């Protein structure tokens, strides 16, 4: 399915340890300022393929040659144009994204740095899925050799599928397609 960053304060954060995002945390204002990031989709397809869907703009930073950081056209290879895959290890609680330029959260963050160039074009994240399966916290460590426990967090929400009710509809040509009764689910008067 498709996921987006949760449109809330704290959807992105980084700090010296898991659970301690004291270096920087996104604010409520960032949801608007970085709207081009919060509308990006991270799509896990049933066939194991993965897509970064950014549309015409995403959030760009100085490491990509954009200073000050701002919304702009996605820059290759972090533009969703390359094939990528995903793999979940439920026992380990990890998601591995493989493919040139593929990522979750921010393109710069990977297991050995913050420069957008992961080893073997592969990034492994830890994840925690909510009970209802509609939200997911993703964390990653190892990017800061000076502070080995340093961790980024990305909070995601599942994108609800669009259900189209527009257009022409007709009753199914089966017995019981139309009925009436004294209560919902009880069509005892006529079917």
Residue ranges and their predicted role:
Residues 4, 20-22, 170, 186-188:
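Asparagine/serine/threonine-enriched low-complexity, disordered tracts
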Residues 4, 19, 25-34, 64:
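Charged, composition-biased interaction segments
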Residues 1, 7-8, 13-14, 18:
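Function-determining sites in protein domains
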Residues 149-160:
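A recurrent domain-boundary module in secreted/ectodomain proteins
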Residues 137-149:
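Short, exposed beta-strand-loop hairpins at the edges of beta-sheets
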Residues 1-4, 158-170:
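N-terminal helix-cap/turn-to-beta initiation motif at the start of protein domains
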Residues 1-2, 92-96, 132-139, 167-168:
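Short, hydrophobic/aromatic-rich segments at coil-to-beta transitions
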Residues 10-14, 30-134, 174-191:
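Contiguous, well-ordered beta-strand patches that form the walls/edges
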């Amino acid at each position: 399915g498709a996921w987006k960053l949760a449109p809330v304060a704290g959807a992105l954060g980084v700090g010296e340890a898991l659970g301690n995002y004291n270096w920087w945390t996104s604010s409520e204002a960032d949801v608007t300022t970085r709207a081009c990031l919060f509308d990006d989709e991270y799509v896990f397809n049933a066939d194991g393929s993965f897509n970064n869907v950014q549309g015409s703009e995403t959030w760009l930073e100085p490491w990509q040659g954009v200073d000050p950081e701002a919304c702009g056209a996605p820059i290759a290879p972090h533009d969703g144009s390359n094939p990528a895959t995903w793999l979940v290890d439920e026992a380990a609680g990890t998601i591995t994204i493989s493919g040139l330029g593929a990522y979750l959260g921010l393109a710069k963050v990977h297991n050995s740095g913050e420069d957008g160039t992961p080893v073997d074009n592969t990034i492994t994240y830890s994840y925690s899925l909510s009970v209802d399966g509609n939200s997911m916290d993703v964390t990653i460590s190892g990017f800061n050799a000076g502070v080995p426990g340093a961790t980024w967090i990305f909070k995601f929400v599942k994108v609800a599928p669009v259900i189209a009710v527009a257009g022409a509809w007709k009753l199914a040509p089966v017995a019981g397609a139309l009925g009436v009764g004294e209560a919902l689910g009880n069509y005892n008067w006529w079917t």
